[in-house]
C-alpha cells in the first residue's frame, strides 16, 4: 500500500470511529474531538487518543483502560501483532458497536 492509499484508509477509519460514537452515544457521555488525523475521546474512564502514524503506516490507540496499541491494515482490518482488532477493542471498552470494516 502506498502512502496515499494508507492516508485515505486511515483517515476514513478515524472519521468513521468519531461518527459512530456521535451516532450511538445517546447520553453524550463521550466528548468527541477530531482534529485532522487525531481523535480524542474524553470518557469517564479517561482520554482515548486515536491517530494516524504515516511513517509506520499504522493507527495508534492510547487507551486509559488497556494501554497503547499499534494497528496495521491487512485484509480490510486494523489489527496488531497479537491479533487484536481495533474495532473490537473500541466496542468492548466504549460500549459502541463498530463494523469491522468501515466503508
From Swiss-Prot:
Q: Pfam families, per this entry?
A: Frataxin_Cyay
Function recorded in the entry: Involved in iron-sulfur (Fe-S) cluster assembly. May act as a regulator of Fe-S biogenesis.
Region forming the signal peptide: none
Question: What biological process terms from GO does the record include?
Answer: intracellular iron ion homeostasis; iron-sulfur cluster assembly
Q: Which GO terms describe its cellular component?
A: cytoplasm
Q: Which organism is it from?
A: Rickettsia africae (strain ESF-5)
Q: Which UniProt keywords are listed? A: Iron, Metal-binding
Molecular function per GO: 2 iron, 2 sulfur cluster binding; ferric iron binding; ferrous iron binding; ferroxidase activity; iron chaperone activity
Whichever gene encodes this chain, its name is cyaY
Q: Which Gene3D superfamilies match?
A: Frataxin/CyaY
What top-level branch of life does the organism fall under? Answer: Bacteria
Q: Which cysteines are joined by disulfide bonds?
A: none
Checking SUPFAM superfamilies in the record gives: Frataxin/Nqo15-like
Name of the protein in its database record: Iron-sulfur cluster assembly protein CyaY
Xref: NCBIfam families: FeS_CyaY (TIGR03421)
Family assignment? Belongs to the frataxin family.
Task: Supply the InterPro entries for this chain.
Answer: CyaY, Frataxin/CyaY, Frataxin/CyaY_sf, Frataxin_CS
Whether Iron counts among this entry's keywords is yes
Amino acid at each position: 500500500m502506498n502512502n496515499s492509499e494508507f492516508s485515505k484508509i486511515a483517515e476514513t477509519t478515524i472519521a468513521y470511529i468519531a461518527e459512530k460514537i456521535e451516532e450511538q452515544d445517546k447520553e453524550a457521555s463521550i466528548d468527541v474531538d477530531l482534529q485532522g488525523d487525531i481523535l480524542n475521546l474524553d470518557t469517564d474512564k479517561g482520554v482515548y487518543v486515536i491517530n494516524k502514524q504515516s511513517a509506520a503506516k499504522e493507527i495508534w490507540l492510547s487507551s486509559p483502560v488497556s494501554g497503547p496499541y499499534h494497528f496495521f491494515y491487512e485484509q480490510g482490518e486494523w489489527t496488531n501483532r497479537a491479533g487484536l482488532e481495533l474495532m473490537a477493542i473500541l466496542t468492548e471498552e466504549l460500549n459502541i458497536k463498530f463494523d469491522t470494516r468501515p466503508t
